[in-house]
């Protein structure tokens, strides 16, 4: 990456209270190079310009630390990780996080295997599968301190895919856009059914841009009923 983009990454991360060393920067540079290389073979991201990737992918992912819920050595699952956002940037900065990245695309999982090998990332598991299936598996169900998702699905749908992974007293953090009030209003039934409650909604302004988004911080207050998550067609046809 050019010096300007590196400076944006370093200074932008400081706004989240993150102080990057050069080895962190080198990891982000390798990640960016792999993203560009593999994006020519498959659809990973429409955002490829260097400074845009720094702002809209790297700094956006790192904004999760503003939730106050990122703690070293805790177990985190990234549901629908895509090209690895937000969990790969978080693992670069917090290498002791025990991370699981879940995606339904085998091609994207293959890309992520290359990323973690080239970056030498440890304590990370990649799963090719669907959240509604893996969320029923006792190996993963209610096993995580934290789940995160940057997916574009409405919050009430995301909750059914993500909360079954979270331990009681753990958290789900949804990275959502500027307009969030209606989504929250439409999620009250899902929160009640899935045993979650909104603890806080934090407004985040991305550095070097006019982009505003929100972190919706949801606490798991009890065990999810075993009937959730339902099959994908049921979730889409009649969301909670």
UniProtKB/Swiss-Prot annotation:
<dbReference type="InterPro" id="IPR029063">
    <property type="entry name" value="SAM-dependent_MTases_sf"/>
</dbReference>
<feature type="binding site">
    <location>
        <begin position="103"/>
        <end position="105"/>
    </location>
    <ligand>
        <name>S-adenosyl-L-methionine</name>
    </ligand>
</feature>
<feature type="binding site">
    <location>
        <position position="85"/>
    </location>
    <ligand>
        <name>S-adenosyl-L-methionine</name>
    </ligand>
</feature>
<comment type="similarity">
    <text>Belongs to the methyltransferase superfamily. RNA methyltransferase RsmG family.</text>
</comment>
<dbReference type="InterPro" id="IPR003682">
    <property type="entry name" value="rRNA_ssu_MeTfrase_G"/>
</dbReference>
<feature type="binding site">
    <location>
        <begin position="131"/>
        <end position="132"/>
    </location>
    <ligand>
        <name>S-adenosyl-L-methionine</name>
    </ligand>
</feature>
<keyword id="KW-0489">Methyltransferase</keyword>
<keyword id="KW-0963">Cytoplasm</keyword>
<dbReference type="Pfam" id="PF02527">
    <property type="entry name" value="GidB"/>
</dbReference>
<comment type="function">
    <text>Specifically methylates the N7 position of a guanine in 16S rRNA.</text>
</comment>
<protein>
    <recommendedName>
        <fullName>Ribosomal RNA small subunit methyltransferase G</fullName>
        <ecNumber>2.1.1.-</ecNumber>
    </recommendedName>
</protein>
<dbReference type="GO" id="GO:0070043">
    <property type="term" value="F:rRNA (guanine-N7-)-methyltransferase activity"/>
</dbReference>
<keyword id="KW-0949">S-adenosyl-L-methionine</keyword>
<keyword id="KW-0698">rRNA processing</keyword>
<feature type="binding site">
    <location>
        <position position="80"/>
    </location>
    <ligand>
        <name>S-adenosyl-L-methionine</name>
    </ligand>
</feature>
<dbReference type="GO" id="GO:0005829">
    <property type="term" value="C:cytosol"/>
</dbReference>
<feature type="binding site">
    <location>
        <position position="150"/>
    </location>
    <ligand>
        <name>S-adenosyl-L-methionine</name>
    </ligand>
</feature>
<keyword id="KW-0808">Transferase</keyword>
